[in-house]
């Protein structure tokens, strides 16, 4: 909006500028030119002359300027007493009077040009002297008006309502140069130095001048330069279209150039005219009274004209200031209008916000009422809860007192439990010693053949007993040849029949497992012929929980007992290794780089050596793979790996016969944080190779050598047992690797359990009887009291 008002003000001020420039640029001889000293070199110099008639004849124009200003039907929206309109009318009347004075002066100049005047030769001579330089000065090229018109047409100023035509039809200026008025060394008396006619045609200029500042006007100006040098300026204002800012700027530049050109020509002409007037001025005494009066009138009129021009300039300046004030007022009004609109919009928003807030206040009031109701209800509930909290706090205090009492009692019980644990261990060890540090269990394998069962004529367990086994062996009397049944009875610590389960067998073994947790060395080994069920008793089927043997069940029992002992402050570290003695050679079954399959040993030449520590009574094997375990599943994986690496072969007695002795050892290291007590126990689970006669097993070659090595080691074990039973001074432990490894287990520093496994089949009667006799010999041995392991 501000931009539109500024554009309108520029459009309105343009006609005023055109009027001012036209009046100021009027080439009148009445105006005093600038001093001749400040004139540039391109000013036009007229030849001096004193003969006005001669000048009129040369130029064919009147000496003075005839100026007619016609103001016709000035339409304005203002009243008739408009000061600008009255000022312009006064200027028009004064200029008309001045024109009449110009004509009278021309007549006076013509009277002076009579035959009696003797200054004509002098004028002609001076004109001849100055003709050449005058012509050369007028030859300077000036930009033609027609060219300006062409440029303006190229800028699309030929619009219907925005049209500025500048036509130059001066026939005397065909070369687009201003020539000297001197022709043939004479000055035409009928020529006008400058004859201008300024006409203000009927227009809407003054009406638009006082119209609304937002109206954008268009000015159409036509400058016509004819043969008489008449300049007609016509201005009209229209409300239908507007100047483009860029085109208007270009138009103003061209108008300024035209004004400068007009000022330059006017100044040059005035300067030359003054020079000519001075040269043509007759002697003072030669002027008549009428001429002096005319000259004085001329000077008066000139002063009046200058005064009128000054008044007009002041009026125009005042009008511009009023227009500027009006524009500022309109701008302020527009700002106030915008501010008003903004305030109204803000007021509407504020009213809407007030309505919303009132609605929220009403809603909040309802909610506050509801909250108050809930608060009152909550106060009642809170009061009840406070009472309940007081009651519960009292109950908690009572419970705390009771808990503290129970904790105290628990600490006392724990202390008593630790002392009872010591008593239990002592009593448990005493019971095991009373039972014997070496005990023998007998287990009869179920009969898988079609012959007599174990409860038949071969083996029988008397009713009401669990430690006797009767052997019914058919015999033939050598004296009379009669067949008879010979009965033999063997007594052991416990006898298990063919129907005994793995769980039942392990119940009595678990007592020895507890001894190993208490810090004692324990040893459990199986003995019997091939196929009597030794491996089944010691390992069983790991995939079927009910068929698991002593080793898996022992591991489960140990971890279960450790869990119970943890509550009493005990922590345990468990390590294990698994080895075999094959042909008097020790192999590590947990070492993946050493494998034995079918009796073919593939070793990486690692040497294993058995060492006994007499101070701690601990037996170790060098270079053995010791694996720490924390869960029974880890032990199962190790057992599977050991079974794959164990040496087995097919014989006549067993399709898969163990060809080596295996030793599985668990080291149990315990520590009690409360009592700082330390224990270290060893549990050896040994599966001996099957004892068999060479003639019956039918082995040859390598298997024959294996059988001989097995029988030798078992014979050495029998010799050791016999020496212990007979309490001999020298015990032959070093006769085999097996006896040397079991030195601390069967030599009086360990709790030992021997399982003798027998086959119920009649064909195995002789081998079973031999195993029973060997077990009875072991059972008759008396070992010294077992001692706890020393912790270093």
Curated annotation (Swiss-Prot):
GO biological process, one term: microtubule-based movement
Localization terms from the record: Nucleus; Cytoplasm, Cytoskeleton, Spindle
Coiled coil: 284-423
Polar residues compositional bias, start-end: 34-50
Pfam families: Kinesin
Binding site for ATP: 528-535
Span of domain Kinesin motor: 437-781
Conditions for induction: During the developmental stage.
Described function: Microtubule-dependent motor that is probably involved in microtubule organization in the mitotic spindle.
Family the entry assigns: Belongs to the TRAFAC class myosin-kinesin ATPase superfamily. Kinesin family. NCD subfamily.
Protein name: Kinesin-related protein 2
Taxon lineage: Eukaryota, Amoebozoa, Evosea, Eumycetozoa, Dictyostelia
């Amino acid at each position: 909006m501000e931009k539109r008002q500024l554009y309108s003000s520029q459009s309105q001020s343009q006609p005023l500028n055109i009027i001012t420039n036209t009046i100021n640029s009027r080439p009148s001889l009445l105006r005093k030119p600038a001093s001749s000293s400040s004139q540039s070199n391109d000013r036009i110099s007229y030849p001096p002359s004193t003969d006005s008639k001669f000048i009129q004849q040369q130029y064919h124009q009147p000496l003075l300027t005839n100026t007619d200003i016609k103001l016709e039907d000035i339409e304005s929206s203002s009243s008739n007493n408009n000061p600008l309109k009255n000022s312009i009318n006064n200027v028009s009347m004064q200029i008309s009077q001045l024109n009449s004075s110009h004509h009278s002066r021309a007549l006076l100049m013509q009277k002076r040009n009579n035959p009696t005047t003797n200054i004509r030769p002098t004028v002609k001579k001076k004109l001849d002297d100055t003709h050449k330089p005058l012509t050369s000065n007028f030859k300077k090229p000036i930009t033609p008006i027609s060219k300006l018109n062409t440029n303006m047409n190229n800028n699309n100023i030929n619009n219907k309502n925005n049209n500025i035509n500048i036509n130059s039809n001066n026939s005397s200026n065909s070369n687009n140069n201003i020539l000297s008025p001197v022709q043939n060394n004479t000055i035409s008396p009928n020529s006008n130095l400058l004859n201008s006619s300024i006409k203000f045609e009927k227009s809407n200029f003054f009406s638009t001048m006082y119209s609304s500042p937002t109206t954008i006007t268009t000015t159409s100006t036509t400058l016509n330069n004819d043969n008489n040098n008449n300049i007609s300026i016509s201005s009209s204002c229209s409300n239908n279209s507007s100047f483009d800012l860029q085109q208007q700027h270009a138009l103003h530049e061209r108008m300024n150039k035209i004004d400068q050109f007009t000022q330059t020509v006017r100044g040059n002409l005035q300067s030359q005219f003054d020079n000519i007037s001075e040269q043509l001025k007759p002697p003072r005494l030669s002027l008549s009274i009428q001429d002096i009066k005319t000259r004085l009138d001329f000077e008066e009129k000139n002063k009046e004209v200058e005064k009128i021009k000054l008044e007009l300039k002041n009026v125009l300046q005042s009008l511009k200031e009023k227009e500027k004030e009006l524009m500022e007022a309109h701008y302020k009004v527009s700002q106030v209008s915008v501010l008003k609109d903004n305030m109204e919009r803000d007021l509407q928003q504020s009213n809407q916000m007030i309505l919303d807030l009132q609605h929220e206040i009403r809603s909040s009031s309802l909610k506050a009422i509801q909250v108050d109701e809930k608060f009152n209800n909550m106060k009642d509930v809170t009061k009840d809860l406070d009472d309940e909290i007081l009651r519960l706090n009292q109950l908690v205090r009572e419970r705390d007192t009771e808990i503290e009492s129970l904790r105290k009692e628990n600490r006392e019980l724990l202390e008593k439990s630790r002392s009872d644990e010591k008593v239990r261990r002592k009593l448990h060890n005493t019971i095991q010693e009373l039972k014997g540090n070496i005990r023998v269990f007998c287990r009869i394998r179920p009969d898988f053949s079609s012959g007599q069962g174990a409860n038949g004529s071969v083996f029988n367990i008397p009713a009401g007993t669990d430690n006797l086994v009767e052997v019914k062996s058919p015999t033939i009397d050598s004296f009379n040849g009669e067949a008879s049944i010979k009965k033999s009875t063997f007594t052991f610590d416990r006898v298990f029949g063919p129907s005994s389960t793995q769980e039942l067998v392990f119940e009595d073994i678990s007592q020895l497992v507890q001894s190993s947790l208490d810090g004692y060395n324990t040893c459990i080994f199986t003995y019997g012929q091939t196929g009597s069920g030794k491996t089944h008793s010691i390992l069983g089927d790991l995939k079927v929980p009910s068929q698991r043997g002593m080793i898996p069940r022992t591991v489960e029992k140990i971890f279960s007992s450790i869990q119970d002992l943890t509550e009493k402050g005990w922590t345990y570290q468990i390590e294990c290794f698994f080895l075999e003695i094959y042909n008097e050679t020790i192999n590590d079954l947990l070492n993946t780089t050493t494998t034995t399959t079918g009796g073919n040993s593939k070793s990486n030449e690692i040497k294993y050596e058995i060492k006994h520590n007499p101070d701690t009574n601990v037996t170790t094997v060098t270079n053995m793979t010791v694996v720490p375990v924390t869960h029974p599943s880890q032990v199962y994986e190790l057992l599977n790996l050991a079974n794959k690496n164990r040496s087995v072969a097919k014989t006549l007695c067993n399709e898969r016969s163990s060809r080596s002795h295996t030793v599985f050892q668990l080291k149990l290291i315990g520590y009690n944080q409360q009592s700082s007590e330390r224990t270290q126990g060893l549990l050896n689970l040994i599966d001996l190779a099957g004892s068999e006669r060479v003639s019956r097993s039918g082995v040859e070659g390598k298997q024959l050598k294996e059988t001989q090595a097995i029988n030798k080691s078992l014979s050495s074990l029998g010799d050791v047992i016999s020496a212990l039973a007979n309490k001999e001074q020298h015990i032959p432990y070093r006769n085999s690797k097996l006896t040397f490894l079991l030195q601390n287990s069967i030599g009086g520093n360990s709790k030992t359990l021997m399982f003798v496994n027998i086959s119920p089949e009649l064909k195995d009667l002789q081998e079973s009887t031999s195993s029973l006799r060997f077990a009875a010999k072991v059972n008759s041995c008396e070992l010294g009291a077992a001692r706890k392991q020393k912790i270093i």
